[in-house]
């Protein structure tokens, strides 16, 4: 289970699950994960990256989340997949002690929830957690310089803590923190496609969704997904993978 943008390699017509796996493969490839590498997954969500990196790349993963519900879900998933020796799951804030010297650090659609005032400290924390020469990948939603971020609807009903900025502003903040940005991949079209898949699944399971969260809440999510797909398709919002390294010995 994943709640972030999937990825369809050019020319593919894969289903959503395969596209999510392709996104995870893309992240792991950019981070150049090798067996035994230490990966920190900041805001690990439902555990898809942590489990994928451990199972398919042999990474030793530390995954952190502040959500008790996500922690319980991921813990069960780790046990079911037999990954207890490779994934260290922690219920904590990324600012709390979590070790250091990681070969790679990933933050997948977590930075939007940090807040404008806290983002410089967030970027500095990413730099401090990765070893010199290590890689950092930030996947994050962006907006145009003169366009609103989440907007009143999202802030009221979906994600009151969401803050988005232009891509260039995020790159500057990462560079100001001492990271060297090596590459950016824009994935806007992929998010429109991802959300259309989510909306189709919601419609297909509409009675179950209403039974689970009630009619009003289900309608809010239907409107959110329909509008969200449209703003990505229209280019009013984007999503980008930003790859950076901490300068030092071993940087490539």
List the predicted regions and their residue ranges.
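Substrate-binding/catalytic lobe of Class I Rossmann-like enzymes that use SAM or dcSAM, i.e.
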Residues: 142-252
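Conserved SAM-binding strand-loop segment of SAM-dependent methyltransferases
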Residues: 81-94
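Conserved beta-strand signature within the Rossmann-like core of class I S-adenosyl-L-methionine
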Residues: 133-140
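Conserved Class I S-adenosyl-L-methionine-dependent methyltransferase catalytic core
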Residues: 1-30
């Amino acid at each position: 289970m994943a709640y972030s943008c999937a990825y369809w390699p050019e020319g593919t017509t894969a289903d959503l699950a395969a596209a999510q796996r392709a996104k995870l493969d893309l992240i792991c490839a950019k981070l150049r994960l090798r067996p035994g590498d230490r990966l920190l997954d900041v805001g690990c969500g439902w555990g898809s990256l942590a489990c994928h990196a451990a199972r398919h790349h042999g990474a030793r993963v530390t995954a952190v989340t502040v959500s008790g519900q996500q922690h319980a879900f991921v813990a069960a998933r780790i046990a079911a997949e037999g990954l207890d020796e490779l994934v260290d799951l922690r219920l904590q804030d990324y600012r709390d002690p979590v070790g250091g010297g990681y070969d790679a650090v990933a933050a997948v659609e977590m930075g939007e929830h940090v807040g404008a005032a806290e983002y410089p400290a967030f970027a500095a924390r990413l730099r401090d957690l990765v070893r010199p020469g290590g890689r950092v990948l930030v996947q994050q939603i962006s907006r145009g310089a003169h366009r609103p971020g989440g907007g009143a609807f999202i802030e009221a009903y979906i994600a009151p803590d969401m803050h988005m900025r232009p891509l260039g502003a995020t790159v500057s903040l990462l560079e100001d923190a001492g990271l060297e940005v090596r590459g950016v991949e824009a994935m806007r079209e992929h998010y429109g496609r991802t959300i259309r898949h989510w909306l189709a699944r919601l419609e297909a399971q509409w009675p179950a969704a209403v039974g689970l969260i009630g009619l009003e809440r289900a309608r809010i999510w239907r409107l959110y997904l329909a509008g969200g797909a449209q703003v990505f398709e229209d280019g009013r919002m984007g999503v980008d993978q930003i790859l950076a390294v901490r300068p030092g010995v071993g940087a490539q």
